[in-house]
C-alpha cells in the first residue's frame, strides 16, 4: 500500500516533534522511556494519513511500520505483531532504518501493555483544563447516603449481632491473620482527556501511567494511617498512593498481568488436584506458588505481591477453591468454618443454566440454619458499605443514577452443611480483620444505602486477600459464562469481560440484571446490534463500555437503560451517532472517539445531563453545532484529531461548567495559537469577546519585501496600474518638512489600495471558475510556473456560532471584491529597512518577496526574508516573485529553469513558501496571473489541507500542513478590537508612545472597563500581532510598561541613530549612553523613554548594550593622545581600533558585557508633547565643514594598520605599549575619575539604576573582512606557532545573532585588535603579574562567522601551547554559556586539524564525536586524511584531554586506594580514600545511568572530510523562531538610499569599495588554493577510503535529503573498516557525553582555584572518571546542622560566625577573580566542613561542587537547578541573573545556620511549584526574634527581591567582622 518513499516520509512525520507523542511510562513498577501505546499509533495514523479510511487499514500500516523496523516492542518475548491495544512500543532509533524494504521480522518483541489509557496525540495537542478544587466528593455523598439509611437498617443489624459475635470468636483461632491491608485500586481523571482515556477498559491513574502527566487522586492523602496495616471500613476507602507499604496498580496492568500469568510457557505452572465428592480433577495453584511467581516477575516484596494477587482475585481473574480437608477433620473444619463464606467454586460447580430464582429458593429453605455473612465490596471512589441481606434475601435494592449498591452474598446453609460432612468441598473463611469489624454493631457498616458510582469501570471489590500458604488453592476463570455465573452467585455489581474474544453475549447475563451496574465488554468482537439485546435487560445498568469492537449501530432497546450515566462507544465503526443515544436522558458521559463520524447531530442538545463528551479522532467532523450550547452541565469537550474543525465556536463561552477543552492546536485557527497556547482561561475569554459582537476586517495587508534593486516598487506599480493610489505618510512626526515633490522619495512606507474582484458567491458556495476572475486578456501566455493550488474549493461563511450562514436567495450571484492595502517599503536607509521592517510585519498579511531572476541565488537574501516573515507570521502565505523575466536571456529565455533552481534552493534550506512565480513589471507579463494566485490563495485558506497534485505547484505535504491560515475573507474579529485599533490610530497622531496607564485610559474610550484588564491584554496582543502597535507582554522586564502606537516612529528612532554615525558614533560602532540625548532630542523622544527604547531595540537584536567599565574612557584617552605618540614606528604602534588599552589591577574583574536585562524601575507617568509638532533635526556633525581630503585622512587614521608578521615583533610592540599604557592612564587619571565616578553604573534622575554606559550597533560595522586581516593573523603563522580551534555548525541563518553575542562578549572581555560585522580578532589583556612570553596575552584569537556554510569558527594561535590551551578553554567556556543560555542549537561540532601550516589555513574537520571516541579508547593520536600525519589529540582538543590542566594533577587508578563510601549523588559516588599517603575524598562519576537522561544515539554523517571552503556542503536548514540578521548589504547601495541625508559618507564608501575589491581578490586567490587542495584531498580519499565512500553512496541513495542530527559521527581512516552497526560510539548517549563535558569543566575550573575556603582538587582520573579532593571529615553543612537539631543542641555563636565567614570568604574569592565565577548552586549540602588537625573544636568551612559554575561575563538566563529552596526570585522567573543570585543563596545559608532548619520547611509545602509561587510573591523564612539584630539585617539584605540591593561578598565580610567585634565588645 505504501512504497519506499512514502514510508520514509511517514517515518519522518510520525517521529517529528509534531508527530506521535512519546513519553516515559510506568508498567508494573518499571519505567520505560520514550514509548507509546499501540492504539495511540493507530489513532495517529487514522487521523493523519488521508489515504487511510478505516482503522483496519491503520492497523495494517502500523504492522508495515513494525515489519520495517521503524517501530518495535519495548521488551522481548512476545510475537512480533502490531496490536491495536494497550501495548508499549517505541521508535527503533538504534537501528539503521534507511532500508525500509528489508522487513525486520526479528525486531525485539513482546509488547508491554500500557498501564493506563494514555492520551493519544495526532499532532500538537491542545489539552486545556480549568483547575478547580471540588469540595464535594464521592466520599461525602456516600457518607450522607449512609447516614440517611442507618436508622432503616438498625433492626436488621441488631438481629445479626449474635451471629457476628460468634463469627468473631470462632475466627480468633483462624489461620487467616495476615496483617497486609486489602488491595487498593486508585484511579484519577486525566487532565488531558482523549478517546483512549474514555474508551479504555478503565480510567486509570495517570500518575502511574506516565511520569509526565499530572493526576488528581480521588482519595484524601491526609487520612491514611501509615502505622498500621489493619483498618476499619471507613479507613480502607482513604488509602492513597503516598504510602510506600501499600501497592496500587491500575486495572489495565492487572489485566495484562493476568494474561502473562495464564501463559502456559512463562506463566504460572498449574497443579492437578481433586475436589468434591466425585473427585473431579481441576488445574489449580496454591497461594504461595502465585506469590513466588509475582515476586520473581515484578521484583517486589512478598507483602506487595499479596496486594497484587488480591487485586487480581477481585477482578475475578481467579477464584479461591479452598483447602482440601480429610474426613477425620470434618468436625474441626465445621467449627473453624462457621460463619464462613461459600467460595466462588460455586461458579464452576453449578450448571450454567441455573437461575437466580432457584438459588434463592434453595436459600430460603435453609434460612433457619444459615448464618448471614458479608462480603466487603470496595468501590474505588467511595467508602466501603456493607449491606446485609436477610435469610430470605428480601432486602430491596436502592437504585439511583449516580450510586451503586454494594451487596453481599448469602450462601445456602445446605451447601455449607454439605461441605462439612465430608463432601470434599473446599471452604474458605473470612479474614480476621473482617470478622472483627463485623462484630461491632455499627449501623453504618450494615446499611444498604447505595454507593457513589465510580467514574471508571473498575469493579467493586472486597477485602479478601490471597493467602501466602501452600494449602490454599485457586483456579483461573477463563470462560465468559463462568465469570457471569460467578458474578451472579456473588451478586457483584461490576462485570468485566474485556479481552475475551466475545462475539455473542451469553444469555445467562440476565441473571445479573437485579444488581449489575457496571459492565465492560471492550476489546471484543461484537459487530451486530442484535448481539447487544441482552444488555438492554440490565435495567439497573449505570456504566457500559463497548469500546474497541466493530459496532456500527445500537439496538433501540437501549432506551430501556434509564439509569445509564456512562456510555463508551469509542474505537468502533459508527458513522452517525445512534438515535437511541439521545433517548438516554440521564447520560453524563458519552465517548464516541475514533469512529467514522462525519457530523454531530443537532439532537445532541437533548442530553441535558451530559457532563463529558468525547468526539476525538473523528476526522470527518467539520463543525461543532450550536445545539451543543444547550448542554449547560457540560464540563469536558474533546474534539482532538477532528481535522476539519478549524474554529471553536463562540457559544462555548456560555457553558457555565465547562472546564476542559481538547483539540488539535495546529488545526484550530480561531482562536489563534497565541490565544490557545495560554490556556483555558484565555480561550474562553477570547470566545466571550467574539460572542459580544464580531466584524470582518475591511482590508487585508499585502506586504512587498525583498532585497534592494529587485523591483519592489515596480511590482507595486504594476499591480496597481490604472487604480487610484492612496499614499500614507507613516513618519509625519519625524520627517523633515519637505515639498510635495519630495514626498514620494522620503515617505518611508507608501500604502496603496488595491481592489480585486472575487468570484461571485452563490447560495451553495463560491464559484471559483477562472472565467469569473478579473484577468487581463492581453498578457502573454503564462509559462510553467510554481504556484499554489488553483483547484476548485468552496469555503462557507460562518456566523458566531460556527454554523453556515444562509445567503438570501437571489436570481443572480452576488458580486464581491477584496481590498488589499499594499505596503511598499521606501526606507531612507538600507540598514533601517533591513532591521525595522519587522516592526510592521503582521500575521494577517499576504507577503510577496521579490528576487531578480538574473542574479545569483546565493546573494538573493531569500533566506533572510522568509525567516524574518516566519518569525512574526509562521502561517502567512508567502510568494517568491521572480522579477525581470523580460530581460532573462539564459537557457534560451526559458524561465522554467531558474524557477526550478529556486524550488531546489528553497527545498534544500527547508524554506516553506506558498508558491514561486515569475513576472515582468515592464511588460506586465504574469501580473494578472499573480493577482489570480492571490485571490485563489485567499479563497483556499479554509480548505488548505487539501492535497494538490499539480506538478507545476511548489507544494508538498509538509508545506501544505504548515502553511495554513484561517479564511481571512470571512474571519470574524471581536468588534471591540477593531474599535480599539481605530482609536489608537487617532491617538498616534498626537503621541506615538504612551505608558501603560495612559494606554488604559485610552482604552476606556473603546468600552474597556477597569474590570476588563484581561480583555484589554488580549486585544493589545492581537493588535501587536497585526503590526498595528508594538507591545511586549513580558513580566520579566519593563517592556510591558509602555506601548508604541506608531511603529514608524520607532523605526525613525533607529534611523536617527544611524544618522549620528559620524557625529556621536565612532568607527567601532560604539555609542556612548551620555550622547544619546544629543541624538534623541527631548521634543522627539522624551528622555524618560530612552532606556526603554534601547531595551526594545535589543529585544529585536538590532543593537546591544555594553556593561560599565573603564575601557571607554581609556579608549577616548588613546584617541586624544594618539598625536602625542605619533612618532612611534608602525612596528611599535597600534591604532585606536586595533587595540583597546586598559589599565586594570590584576585583582579587578575584567570589563564585562551584559544584554539589556537589568530591571529599571518604571518612570512616573510621562506627559508627552504633541508629536505632530516635532520633527527630526539633523545633529551637529563636525565633519560637515571638513574637506573630502581631511575626511579621508581621518578615516585612514581610524583604520587598523598592518603590523609585522613576526610574533617576536608583535610581542616587542606589546611591551613598548606597556609604558604608553601607564603614561596614558596617569595623564588623564583625573579625567577618568571625573567622567566615571560611578564605575559600576549610572543613576537616573529618578534613582533608577543602569548597568551599562555604551551601545554597540553591529550594522554600522564594515561588512567585508579588513584588507590587513591576513597580515595581522599571520603574526601567529610561524612554524613554531600552535593552533587550537573549534567549528560550530548551525542549522539556520539566525546563528548570525549568536555570533553577534559572542563578539559583544569578547569586545570588552578581551582586547580587540580588529573586528567587523562577521568576525573579530583579539588577544587577552595582559596583567602586570604575567610574563608576556608565557601569558595568554601573547596569543591571538580569531572568531568568524561564515555566512555561506553557517559556521562559527574559532581559532587560537600562540607560541606557547599551554597559554593557547588556557585561552582556548576560556573562549569555549563563554561560547558554551551563550549557546546554553540563549538555547541556540548547533547541529554539529568539529575540531579543525593543525598538523601543518597548510592544514591550519584549510583544515580537515574532525567531528568531535570521533575525537571523543578515539580518546575514550585510550588512543592519543588520530590521522589527518589530508597530510596523512598523526595528530596528537592533546594538541587539537585540550578541553577533551584536559591538557590545559597541569600534568601533576593527573592521577592513575593504581595510585588510589578506595575505602568506605561516604556520599551518593545523582550520577556520582564519593568515597573516602588514600592518595599519596594522605586521606582524600574521591568523587567517582557513574555514567552507566546516563541512558535514563537521553537515549539518543549517534548516526553517521554522509561526508568524510569537511573543509571550510566546501561551500557546496548539503545542510538541511530549518526555520527558527529567533531573531534574524540581515544579509550583507553593499555600502555603495546604502549611499544611494540615504541620498542627501548622508552626503558625508561618499568618500568613506569609496574606501570601503576599495577594501572590498582587494578583499574579493584575496578571496579569489584563496578559493583557487582551496580548489587545488580539494582536488588533492579527493584523490587521497579515493585511494585510501574507497570502501567507506561506497558505503556513503549507498546511504545517500537510501535518503532523499541529507539531515543534520544533534550529535553526528563521521568515520575516519582509523575506523574506516568498522561497519555502522559495530561503531561503539553509537552506544553512547548524548546525555553521557554532556555529563563527561561537565566533569571536564569542573576539573578545569577547580584546577585554577586556590583558596583556603575552596575545596582543593588534588587530582583527577579518566579511568574511571573521578576527581580527587581534600577530605573534609565532618561532611556537609546540611548534615552537620541536621545532627545538631536532632541532638537538641545549638550552634555556638562563635562557631556560627566562623562558618559563615569562611563561606563568604570563599565566595568573595570566586566573585573577585578574573573573570568572576558564579557558583549557581550555592547551598548547605555543597558546603563541606572539616575540623582543624590540632584543634578538633575549630571548624573550617569550604565551598565545593562547581559543576554548574560559570564565568560571569554577562548575565545568565538558564535555570540549572530544580530545587527552589536556595534559588533567587530572578532565577525562578527565568530572568537573566548574575553573581547576585549567589548572594541570595548565601542569605538562605545564614538563616539555616542560625535556625538549624531547611528554609521554608516551616510552611510544609507539598509541591515545589507552590513554593516557587510563594517565593516570587515575597515569602521568606521567619527569622527568630532573638536573633542578633545585625545578623538578622544581613539576612534580610541578602535575600532582597531586588538583586541590585543585595550586598557584595566583600561588604558581607565587613558586616560579619563587625558582628564578631560587637560580640566580643559586649562580653
UniProtKB/Swiss-Prot annotation:
It comes from Dictyostelium discoideum. The keyword Ubl conjugation does not apply. Residues 121-223, 768-793 have a biased composition (Low complexity). Residues 1456-1864 form the Protein kinase domain. One of its GO terms (cellular component) is cytosol. LRR repeats lie at residues 491-512, 515-536, 540-561, 563-584, 586-607, 609-631, 633-656, 657-678. SUPFAM superfamilies: beta-sandwich domain of Sec23/24 (SSF81995), L domain-like (SSF52058), P-loop containing nucleoside triphosphate hydrolases (SSF52540), Protein kinase-like (PK-like) (SSF56112), Winged helix' DNA-binding domain (SSF46785). It is an enzyme of class 2 (transferase). GO terms for molecular function: ATP binding; protein kinase activity; protein serine kinase activity; protein serine/threonine kinase activity. Coiled coil: none annotated. Its EC number is 2.7.11.1. PANTHER family: SERINE-THREONINE PROTEIN KINASE (PTHR23257), SERINE_THREONINE-PROTEIN KINASE ROCO8-RELATED (PTHR23257:SF970). Residues 96-115, 121-225, 763-813, 942-961, 1163-1207, 1509-1546 are annotated as: Disordered. This is Probable serine/threonine-protein kinase roco8. Belongs to the protein kinase superfamily. TKL Ser/Thr protein kinase family. ROCO subfamily. Keywords: ATP-binding, Kinase, Leucine-rich repeat, Nucleotide-binding, Repeat, Serine/threonine-protein kinase, Transferase. It comes from the Eukaryota.
